[in-house]
Amino acid sequence: MRRHLAVIVFIAVSAAPAAALDLPARKPGLWQLDMTFVGRKLPPQSIKECLDAATDKLMNANVSGAGAGVTCSKQELSRSGATLTVDSVCTANGATVTSHAVVTGSFDSAYTVDVTSTRTGGPPMPGAAPGGTHESHTTIAAKWLGPCQPGQRAGDMIMGSGRTVNILDLQKQMQAAPKR
């Protein structure tokens, strides 16, 4: 369960634009991210996340390869009108992921991220067959719902199950965890 949660959190964070690639920041407030997966046996997921400018910037830095143990040999951004295309090759935990993402929409109201990726090596991923090369297609439809709700703090992610996880707290726990 914990591993599945980490994957969902990573996927949700992946919807954020990568700061190193100079993509627009998302509007602060409460965002809903609806994710569908092809090529992995995972059900659709819906997550709500409360953002402020600082949290969005931190999430973007983590996704763009600035996180510990992540090395990206390629990160390229191209723009054509309102469409952004990001191509990357990154390695972490012994896995190499080659991704092609197309982002359309507005980071103030609603956007869609369409990602195709190929993963080789590394530990097995939830919902994927063990070993070999895995191809997947993930679509993330994000929409701004309004201000964060009373009692929410920046970094709160409300999972489809209703459980709330704070990405900042999760990051601190992962940094404090003993290395294997």
Regions found by a protein language model. Name each.
Residues 5-6, 10-19:
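Hydrophobic h-region of N-terminal signal peptides that target proteins for export
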Residues 21-180:
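Subset-of-secretome marker
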Residues 1-2:
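N-terminal secretory signal peptides that target proteins for export/translocation
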